[in-house]
């Protein structure tokens, strides 16, 4: 029974670490860029698009398609960075138990 009690304590500690990591993720913001910095997008920790900044040189007639492509590319860049930071935070929170949890739904490690 001592082992079960220890396991329960470990599970509770990990649950708290994961809750803390999720709180940090909620506060996280990342930027992605494209076009050599002509387009910058900011994503929140939940993946929500928070901001788009366009270089003034893009705002000319006939540039709509280019702008749209650059926004999509900047968003993809930001999403890639966000996914990496989320995975790192969750890996840190789970510690040595991360390998055992990799197959659980909603857990990216």
Swiss-Prot record:
Name the UniProt key words of this record, in alphabetical order: Cytoplasm, DNA-binding
- Cellular compartment(s): Cytoplasm, Nucleoid
What GO CC terms are in its UniProt record? bacterial nucleoid; cytosol
Identify the domain of life.
Bacteria
Q: Identify the InterPro entries for this entry.
A: YbaB-like_sf (IPR036894), YbaB/EbfC (IPR004401)
Xref: Pfam families: YbaB_DNA_bd (PF02575)
Q: Name one GO molecular function term.
A: DNA binding
Write down the Gene3D superfamilies for this protein, in alphabetical order. Answer: Nucleoid-associated protein YbaB-like domain
4Fe-4S among keywords: no
On subunit structure and binding partners, the annotation says:
Homodimer.
Q: Which family does it belong to?
A: Belongs to the YbaB/EbfC family.
Q: Name the job this protein performs.
A: Binds to DNA and alters its conformation. May be involved in regulation of gene expression, nucleoid organization and DNA protection.
Q: What is this protein called?
A: Nucleoid-associated protein Caul_4574
Organism per entry: Caulobacter sp. (strain K31)
